[in-house]
């Protein structure tokens, strides 16, 4: 499933028993996930449901870390939403697969689990780590809040956090961001054409430079 099932006004970090409702940022994507959860539980009452935050790593075709990798490889300045304090919560696809294996093997008591890294990371620190995968250090340009963030950056201006206490009971250790991003960068170098790129550079060069 997805963290998009939780409305943006809920109390964070979101526990699994939080209200599920439309989120103004995710819209139909989130409500479709709610409907899918309901349909699954009607058919398979003892099914397991996993709700991740932002996934990253090999085979991620969404233009998120790949966008920052492109900026690093092109020695571009990085246009940062304000000062980059907003935090993002991630989960590496390898951790997701390993967690699924644990669930299949151990059949834990909890059947609905938020999954993800326990600690979130600021946009600024995340970009620094992405550039470091190519032995680069980013030069930042601060973009004011008045500029629509999704025009030049991969994430909405929406900070959220999942409570992953249930996950930690059965899968306490997740991959470090440094190792996870390096793995993602190595994959991207060989599979750049598999990522659905967006025209962030075009917007930046036309409107922000």
Label each PLM-derived region with a short phrase.
Residues 23-50, 64:
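Active-site Tyr-X1-5-Lys
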Residues 97, 102-159, 192, 196-201, ...:
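Mid/C-terminal beta-alpha module of Rossmann-like enzyme folds, strongest
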Residues 157-209:
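C-terminal amphipathic/interface module of NAD(P)-dependent oxidoreductases
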Residues 69-81, 135-141, 145:
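A short C-terminal helix-loop "cap" of Rossmann-like NAD(P)-dependent dehydrogenase/epimerase domains
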Residues 3-27, 42:
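Active-site "gating" loop of Rossmann-like NAD(P)-dependent oxidoreductase/epimerase domains
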Residues 50-67:
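Flexible, glycine-rich beta-alpha linker
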Residues 59-60, 87-94, 113-133, 174-176, ...:
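Substrate-binding strand-loop-helix patch
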Residues 62-68, 81-104, 111:
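Substrate-positioning beta->alpha
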């Amino acid at each position: 499933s997805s963290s998009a099932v939780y409305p943006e006004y809920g109390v964070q970090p979101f526990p699994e028993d939080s209200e599920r409702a439309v989120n103004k940022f995710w819209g139909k994507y989130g409500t479709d996930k709610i409907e899918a959860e309901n349909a699954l539980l009607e058919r398979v009452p003892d099914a397991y449901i996993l709700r991740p935050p932002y996934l990253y790593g090999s085979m991620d075709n969404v233009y998120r870390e790949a966008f920052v990798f492109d900026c690093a490889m092109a020695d571009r300045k990085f246009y940062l939403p304000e000062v980059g304090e907003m935090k993002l919560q991630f989960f590496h696809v390898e951790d997701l697969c390993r967690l699924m294996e644990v669930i299949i093997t151990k059949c834990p008591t909890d059947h609905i689990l938020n999954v993800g890294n326990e600690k979130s990371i600021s946009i600024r620190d995340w970009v620094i780590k992405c550039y470091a995968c190519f032995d680069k250090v980013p030069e930042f340009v601060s973009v004011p809040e008045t500029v629509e963030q999704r025009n030049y950056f991969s994430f909405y201006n929406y900070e959220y956090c999942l409570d992953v206490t249930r996950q930690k009971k059965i899968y306490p250790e997740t991959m470090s961001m440094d190792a996870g991003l390096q793995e993602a960068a190595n994959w991207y170098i060989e599979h750049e054409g598999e990522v659905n790129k967006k025209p962030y550079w075009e917007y930046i060069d036309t409107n922000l430079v």
